[in-house]
Amino acid sequence: MKISIYGAGNQRLYLEQLKVPEKFGGEPPYGGAGMAIEFAKAGHDVVLSEPNRDVMSDDLWKKVEDAGVKVVSDDIEAAKHGEIHVLFTPFGRITLNIANTIIEHVPENAIICNTCTIPTPVLYRSLEGILRLKRRDVGISSMHPTGVPGTPSQKYYTIAGKALEGKEYATEDQINKLVELVKSVGKIPYVTPADVVPAVADMGALVTAVALVGVLDYYRVGTQIINAPKDMIEKQILISLQTIASIIETSGMEGLMKVFNKDALLSSAKNMLIDERQEDLNLALKIIEEFDKSTIGEKDISQTYLVAPQALIKEAVSLIGKSAVEGMIRRSSNKLFK
């Protein structure tokens, strides 16, 4: 296959700050450059677009080129090459700008894939105009490595499939092509709903894993020990998660620190220590007790509405119609990445 990768990856971050070789193994270069080497060694025709040669040393660039990867500095040149386009680029607006630059130049039926930089639905919405009018053939998905490319622990690629609300951003053939590519390099393809990818495959998986442990613990305690109704337990889980998410959205972590009283939270949570299996809660209590809020800071929270989003959407659809609501969702979700 012809593969185009955009962004070699910040090698200084991997080597000096994250200490990837010591912690996860493998050899540099990592990131997009590591991905390019992996695909090239599997026999694919790979172009790596990176306008900034300073992201890594000359010896690492030589490793990339010796693997058979063609290195270019022009995104449009890379766009004309690939059947599959992988954006290993900085979080947010830069990735959207690159996608908008390349989409008119990619071959017919090409696939543009995000990695950990932006959710697939947001990438699609930023390109929706041209996808509807000129490039209906182009698919949007993800080739999200679950780990740092170039390390032994990176065993999966998460591929964005049909969204939870039913939207398909790529054809079945395009998704199958990504699956085939992943298998060709000895990795495991994991096709998951497009909306779920960031929660299970991005760095935020740390939050997902820790939160899920708390959810599972409370569900077990609530349904099996307290014998509370399942519906009540699920609603209380929703309230906790929605409260935290809503405050962070409007006011950041500083707002969350302002509104949460550590002592009150500890007192309440300690009352939920019911059996010896709750190691997760014991650890959480210890971490919260030792945590110094001044390391983040505080600020007054902005006006925040604590609502159930799915219920709100149903109510809005009944009042103004599905098309209008989908437009509102599109515009509001895009604002997160401006």
From Swiss-Prot:
The keyword Transcription does not apply. It comes from the Archaea. GO terms for molecular function: oxidoreductase activity. Keywords: Oxidoreductase. Belongs to the HMD family. NCBIfam families: hmd_rel (TIGR01724), PRK12557.1 (NF009208). This is H(2)-forming methylenetetrahydromethanopterin dehydrogenase-related protein MJ0715. It comes from Methanocaldococcus jannaschii (strain ATCC 43067 / DSM 2661 / JAL-1 / JCM 10045 / NBRC 100440) (Methanococcus jannaschii). The lineage of its organism: Archaea, Methanobacteriati, Methanobacteriota, Methanomada group, Methanococci.
